[in-house]
Amino acid sequence: MAGTVSLELDPIFLKGLGYLHSKSKDSAEKLKALLDESLARGSDSIYRNSIKEAEVSKVSLPKMTKQDSKSSSSSSASSSITTTSSSKSSTSEKSKKESEKRTLEKIRVDPGEGVEPPKKPRLEKQDSHSSPIAFQTKDIPIPDFTDIDETNADDFAMEMGLACVVCRQMTVTSGNQLVECQECHNLYHQECHKPQVTDKDVNDPRLVWYCARCTRQMKRMAQKTQKPPQKPAPALATTVPLLKDPLVKKAELKPKPETTGSFQAFKRTEVKATAASGNSSSSSSSSSSLPPGLTGWAAFTKATSNVGPSSTKLSTSQSGNSKTSPAASGSKPVGLSALANVKPALATKPSGGSSAGSGNGNNGSGTVPLKAPPPLTLGKQVLSRSASGDSLGKMTVTGSLSPGAAPSSSLGGNGGSGGNGAGNGGNSAGSSSSSGNNNNNGAKASADGKAPTSQESQLNAMKRLQMVKKKAAQKKLKK
């Protein structure tokens, strides 16, 4: 049986197996030679190639195990032989019979003819293997090599930073040297740079030179660094109300002392309290100082109200009738303040027609505007300041002297000695009135005489406070 099996097997296949299992170094070359001879058989080679392609997938695993056992040099060459051997071993008996016929044909062929044809296919095989390699080189590297050949020197110079950025050349002449920018480290020819570089910049021993692009960027950065200190200006503007707030709070906290320089309007709650106290104690505190609850403009109205009653007293004492008190109040500015003065005058009519009674009535009417409601005193203050000038101008307003009409009232005079007629009337009233009334009048006159000095001191204090506040606000803004 062994003899029959040996006859059925192809001798080329046996040779291939022998070369495959041999450990000699030439086994790979001999396997290549056998492969070339088998491929050079014409139609038989085509048939064998078809069988190889059909069964390559089936025998892929045994091929890998055999190739791993061999050396790396023989593995690439023996893979094709293993495909042929595996295909032949797996074919049917018909393929074996055909292989026997092929061996007979090979024997009939002359040895010279058998040697010559394999040489031709070897060349063809080499061409076939070299052709795809040639295509690969043409597809990928050949265009790259052409580009590199053209721009290799320029690119190398540019990468190394040895060439001009504009013209991409390294040529240097006496008037056209390469200058390096200290910021971006690019090289420029003196002529290539748009603002041409002068020889002074080239020969500068400090070697500090900046290109046009870098100079622009540096200018922009300098402007940006200068702008941030300018931007906080609105921040200072926003801090101004913050600075004002504590000043306002201080002004609101200061109404408690009697003399303050702030012109803030007082609160309604304080107004009601002062009005109630004024109505309750209308006949008392004739020559008292400024009330503690009044601040700002109310303090000025208090001072003017102290001046007003003294003049009305002089006029009423001259007429000698209690009915003249409404007329005296009529000499004052017409408005709500006049009505406020009329009510206490009417209340004093039942006291009698004597000069002493009129003096008492005037005392009552004089004390009411001291504690009058602040809105009324505000209006009165504005009118009296515009009409008489109060303590600032110290001007006197004189009216027509008639026994039935309103006599002259000296506003802002020296404490009761106004015009000549009013002064005479005051003297006659002092002689005709009782000693108690004279004492009251004297006290009021003395109080009225002190009023302008207190107003002047208030004005001076207010001016000083305003100046101090302005200076403090300016210092805070400067900080």
From Swiss-Prot:
Annotated zinc fingers (PHD-type), start-end: 161-217
Residue ranges, compositional bias (Gly residues): 354-364, 412-428
Assembly, per entry: Component of the Integrator complex, composed of core subunits INTS1, INTS2, INTS3, INTS4, INTS5, INTS6, INTS7, INTS8, INTS9/RC74, INTS10, INTS11/CPSF3L, INTS12, INTS13, INTS14 and INTS15. The core complex associates with protein phosphatase 2A subunits PPP2CA and PPP2R1A, to form the Integrator-PP2A (INTAC) complex.
PROSITE patterns noted in UniProt: ZF_PHD_1, ZF_PHD_2
Keywords in alphabetical order: Metal-binding, Nucleus, Zinc, Zinc-finger
Gene: ints12
Subcellular location, record wording: Nucleus
Keyword presence, Metal-binding: yes
Pfam families for this protein: PHD
Principal localisation: nucleus
Organism expressing this protein natively: Danio rerio (Zebrafish)
Protein name as it appears in the record: Integrator complex subunit 12
GO CC terms of this entry: INTAC complex; integrator complex
The keyword Repeat is annotated on this UniProt entry: no
Similarity section: Belongs to the Integrator subunit 12 family.
Bias (Basic residues): 466-479
Sequence ranges of Polar residues compositional bias: 305-328
Region (Disordered): 57-140, 221-241, 274-293, 305-479
Gene3D superfamilies per UniProt: Zinc/RING finger domain, C3HC4 (zinc finger)
